[in-house]
Amino acid sequence: MMKKPVVIELAVVVLAAVVAGGYWWYQSRQDNGLTLYGNVDIRTVNLSFRVGGRVESLAVDEGDAIKAGQVLGELDHKPYEIALMQAKAGVSVAQAQYDLMLAGYRDEEIAQAAAAVKQAQAAYDYAQNFYNRQQGLWKSRTISANDLENARSSRDQAQATLKSAQDKLRQYRSGNREQDIAQAKASLEQAQAQLAQAELNLQDSTLIAPSDGTLLTRAVEPGTVLNEGGTVFTVSLTRPVWVRAYVDERYLDQAQPGRKVLLYTDGRPDKPYHGQIGFVSPTAEFTPKTVETPDLRTDLVYRLRIVVTDADDALRQGMPVTVQFGNEAGHE
């Protein structure tokens, strides 16, 4: 009879142990959270001159740290300086022609055109009268048909000269045609565009660093003649620092943009970096070999981009990283 209470007490103890163990396991899972594995993104850019030419100088070498806006190299500027001077001269010529078209004709030019009409009119009147007389003489058989034809030709030439002078005077008095003004304006705009291109080409003969980074390779040396777009430097971008990781679909709800995480490296396992998820791929892919584990080889995963908010020089591109989604990280 005494065994029954002992059994009951033993059952209670076992049940309590199971409950306590389950609670500890649950809390442990909650505290540890989701763990992912990834790498610091390798981000490089090839730098080149947008124009071609002979390399005049290079200011940096492999391993140098560079800053955005820093001059990295220069081509021979002389050909582009000459092209710029030619473009400026072209604008001056086009501007002068356009101004003349807008201003029209001066009073002196109009007076000269009127005098030319008067002179041409007198010449025509004389030629017409002479032709009339020659017609009478030809009818009386005093002159030959050839003499009459010469008189007619002189009259016709004088008439054409008079018409040309009259047209010129009419143009001077009415000003330039709108079509001529529009053509002069278009020529000016074309010259201005050529000037802008020449200025840009001269500017692009200097290579400027687009962002901070570290110079990985220097592909050419001074004296090299480059085609436009030929690679001069390869630069590793140091800021911002991104970590690429992959999450299984089962845990996708925990890896939302804006979620804060802790990032551990082998070199400093007790001092994590801090990061924030900036991007989650909308499409799934098979686990890349760089983060492949035996239980994930056939899994479809989603790529994450994590922005490291406190990166330093110890965090190098390509370095393996452990991403911890603990509660502490998620609510910092």
UniProtKB/Swiss-Prot annotation:
One Gene Ontology CC term in the entry: periplasmic space
Domain of life according to the entry: Bacteria
Pfam family, one: HlyD_D23
Signal peptide: 1-26
Entry keywords, A to Z: Coiled coil, Periplasm, Signal
Coiled coil: 108-209
Protein's UniProt keywords contain Cell inner membrane: no
Subcellular location(s) of the protein: Periplasm
InterPro entries found in the cross-reference section: CusB_D23, UPF0194_membrane_YbhG, UPF0194_transport
Chief location category: periplasm
Presence of keyword Signal: yes
Entry's family note: Belongs to the UPF0194 family.
PANTHER family, sorted: EFFLUX SYSTEM COMPONENT YKNX-RELATED, UPF0194 MEMBRANE PROTEIN YBHG
HAMAP family, sorted: UPF0194
Protein name as annotated: UPF0194 membrane protein YbhG
Organism: Shigella sonnei (strain Ss046)
